[in-house]
């Protein structure tokens, strides 16, 4: 079996208007640079898991509001679901599991996913990226990093920094700090098309 370098995951909460592109873009870049990568679309999986649930509105709000509590049976259902998914992620043997944080509404599940993954395999390496850890005033990724819940984070646009990260250049601006570089038009122009091969686009 071929070694898997990166498993890149989209996380709720996002609308189902269109598929989350960030993991698909990063996958295409990694593949073009000789790394192995797959994606997992938890935005879609979460929606279809819970959309017919009688308490869907409460579950949907729970993901977006950090302090919101739900009934114990719903909390257990969420916990069991994320635990199962975390186990599936660990079972892939990926060197790095990437959690894409689109906005602050993904913060709660991002932390839960990281906790579950580390409980299953404390040696599993996790990194976070996305606008939801870049355009915020609070030190969300830094707190998780300092607590050992994640092993790295990438701020800013990831088109160039993901390559540096994959090569082990953790001193590159935006890796484990907020001092990221703006992506140049030249880098954008040579970015390959997003790779949606692991997505079920018919569900959008």
Language model features by range: what are they?
Residues 22, 26-30, 39-44, 75-187:
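Glycine-rich beta-alpha loop elements in corrinoid/cobalamin-binding modules
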Residues 4, 35, 124-125:
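A structural micro-motif
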Residues 18, 48-50, 138:
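Short Asp/Glu-rich motifs
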Residues 12-14, 72-73, 100-101:
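Short, contiguous strand/loop micro-motifs
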Residues 37-83:
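Conserved N-terminal ligand/cofactor-binding loop architecture of enzyme catalytic domains
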Residues 4-15:
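Nucleotide-activated donor-dependent transferases that construct or modify glycoconjugates
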Residues 14-23:
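Glycine- and acidic-residue-enriched helix-capping/strand-helix junction motifs
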Residues 188, 192-204:
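Radical SAM [4Fe-4S] cluster-binding motif and immediate context
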């Amino acid at each position: 079996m071929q070694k898997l370098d990166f498993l890149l995951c989209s996380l709720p909460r996002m609308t189902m208007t269109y598929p989350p592109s960030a993991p698909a873009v990063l996958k295409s870049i990694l593949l073009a640079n000789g790394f192995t990568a797959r994606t997992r679309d938890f935005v879609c999986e979460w929606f279809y898991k819970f959309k017919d649930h009688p308490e869907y509105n409460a579950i949907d709000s729970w993901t977006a509001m950090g302090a919101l509590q739900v009934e114990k049976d719903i909390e257990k259902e969420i916990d069991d679901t994320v635990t199962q998914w975390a186990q599936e992620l660990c079972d892939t043997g990926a060197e790095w599991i990437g959690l894409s944080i689109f906005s602050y509404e993904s913060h709660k599940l991002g932390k839960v996913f990281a906790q579950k993954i580390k409980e299953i395999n404390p040696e599993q390496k996790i990194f976070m990226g996305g606008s939801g850890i870049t355009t915020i005033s609070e030190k969300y990724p830094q707190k998780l990093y300092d607590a050992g819940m994640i092993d790295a984070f990438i701020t800013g646009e990831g088109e160039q920094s993901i390559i540096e990260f994959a090569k082990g250049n953790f001193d590159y601006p935006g890796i484990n700090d907020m001092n990221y570089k703006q992506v140049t038009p030249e880098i954008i122009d040579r970015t390959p098309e997003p790779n949606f091969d692991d997505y079920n686009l018919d569900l959008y």
